[in-house]
Amino acid sequence: DLHLLSRRQRQMCIRDRTVPLLLLLHGNENDPRTQAETSGFIELCAKENFVVVELEWQGSKDYARMGMDGIEQVVYYLLKTYPQLDASRVYTEGLSAGSATSTGLGIRKSYLFAAVGGFSAGILPGSYRFDCDRQSLLGEAIQKSGAVEMPYFSATGTSDTVVPFINKDNWQKNAFFAAWQIYQIMNGMSVTERPDFSKDTIFGITLENRETIWTNKGISMETGVLSKNGVPLIQMVAVNDYGHWNFKPAAKMMWDYFMQFSRDPQTKELIYHGRK
């Protein structure tokens, strides 16, 4: 099931000729429409001029499960059907299981996406669900280490009880810490062997551009980046006292992060443009 481009999006493409493409991947057995409507990206794409496509990637009684290869084929179909789309600026993000899948896609399909991210999941240690177990992704990251770079935006709530945030007791089996480590490995960065909460009480890692951001509703977010040669290849966001769900204010943060990167469709090389 593919929720096709709206009329406004098609008209926008005709005007602009080349626009970015963002895939949204819903959570485990969620309704794709719910994911799209609560993500914050539908409102954002109308302002920022990009195309959002929500996939029924997981399958249902009516549709076969896509898997990562199927998701890749959908991207090629869209690029062929809508030549206005920019093949150098294809991104994916998701919620929960969709976030785990987007995280895995950044490693498995590193030639396809310019950046990836997600809310409320990372890489699930000890789990073999959603095509993104730690063991296989770690092997691929090690093989690609230093040769492939993939920007990664990791966001979650500090009060998530479904996929808990990192703390001093769970870090060895924590989905977010596992994802940060594996992306550090693939990106050829210094690898954090274990968190040190004396350096940062939230993330346990010393981050650049570390700040606390407040929304107009009084909710705060902690954020910072890990860089390689001045390029922010990993951005982390923790929404204080928030649970297992999308957080609309962070959508703009993710999109601004994505827009710093494109990928050459021919050479597959990552291109860093800096902040706009």
Task: Annotate each PLM feature.
Residues 28, 57, 158-161, 168, ...:
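Acidic beta-to-alpha connecting loop that harbors the catalytic carboxylate
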Residues 15-63, 125-126, 162-164:
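Short substrate-entry loop that stabilizes the transition state in hydrolases
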Residues 15-18, 43-48, 84-86, 98, ...:
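Extracellular/periplasmic catalytic domains that process cell-envelope and extracellular macromolecules
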